């Protein structure tokens, strides 16, 4: 849920008149170790393989926003400040990135698996002990529409235990209208034709079940699900396997997320067979308190 939330933040700040930059590690991208500017706000300078899938998607979907990658985010951040003069910088996936000072820490909690088993890697999925939630300035619960009210209350109780009286923003991932891959690649977002009735899904995401649930929430019926590891860079063999699986299943289309779609652009596809399901993050509860608190803290820091 990080990428949709970063998109949400960048658009809101941009609308408020800020010149926004995003710093990301660029995990598994060719520029991860060296550092690079993916977009200067006016032009996209790298492809998905060079930038990494998530930073490239951010650059593609956020015109006017600066996007840069590099393991050493302090160094690439200094370069961005010197060359491009942003007024606000969003550090994507940076709660543990100690070398870079920040004014506001936001922790995202996936409602479908909020606290794993309470254990850190490798015995669990947490990167830090739950007690470190006390460092957060605000909490954001994503995919809250995919759990029950009782589960939401339990999440709120756990967060309040670690740090009460900080903003708690509840959000949902809402699917938009699916579009043919060729249209999506050209920047079109409205599918005019009737959609096929039989799909299979394909994804290389950290939480594939969540994407598959979102496909179902969009009213689409998937007859099979193909999963690859998170951040996997697709090959032509992957495409052949997916298209062959779909045809054997009697499906008329393969549906992917936008994060997957950016990695398909260098491959040969039966383009009429492929569809993209865009999603957007929508705030449902706590939005005003969240922004007012952050703006107050930010002004104090300035």
Residue ranges with predicted function:
Residues 11-22:
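Post-Walker A helix-loop "phosphate-sensing" segment adjacent to the P-loop in P-loop NTPases
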